[in-house]
Amino acid sequence: MQRIVTVLCLILGFLLLAVLVAIPAHNVTPALAQEAPKTASPAEGYNIHVLAPHLVDGKQMGPYHHYCKVMAPDPQIVCLIYESTEPNAVLSQVEWIYAKKMTRAAVPLKEWNKNWHDHAVEIAGGRVQVLDLPPDKAKEVADTVATTDGMIYHFYFDGKLPNGKTSIAQAVGHKPLTESEYKASGK
């Protein structure tokens, strides 16, 4: 009896596989996928374009193209970061940006000095460019971001494949803060 059940399961499995192989995948191609009806998704809205170099393993690299999205008005921002503006550029970093009042209240100074950076310092260093916006709007973006701290995750690749390694990249010009500077600047 058990052999009959096993044989029937195998037959049903092969029939199911044959049916799945016979069903066309509606000829889905990248071009057709782009033409599909658009619905709201988390991937929309990364349209603030910023250019800035980073320190990766202590070496200045980039400049990197940040495509940023405001997630909350206090502000909370996420940036997808690429080495170029090519349509198929590889995502090489992600930056989380939060209002100083949030980070300074929650992150211990030692951890902040190691992993976070102050955008006011980075912007004042003159290496950050807000692209694709008129000068008055670019200044507005820079002024808002100057009220925040950022943490950048860098992804490592072996050739074209990610290897699973990450590190915290740092802003060029990052300055560790003293306890009193940290407390005073988080208000």
Residues covered by each model-derived region:
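Primary mode marks residue(s) on the alpha4-beta5-alpha5 output face of response regulator receiver
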Residues: 32-80, 86-187
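Positively charged n-region of N-terminal signal peptides that target proteins for export
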Residues: 1-4
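Cleavable N-terminal signal peptides
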Residues: 25, 30-31
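Bacterial N-terminal signal peptides
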Residues: 9-25
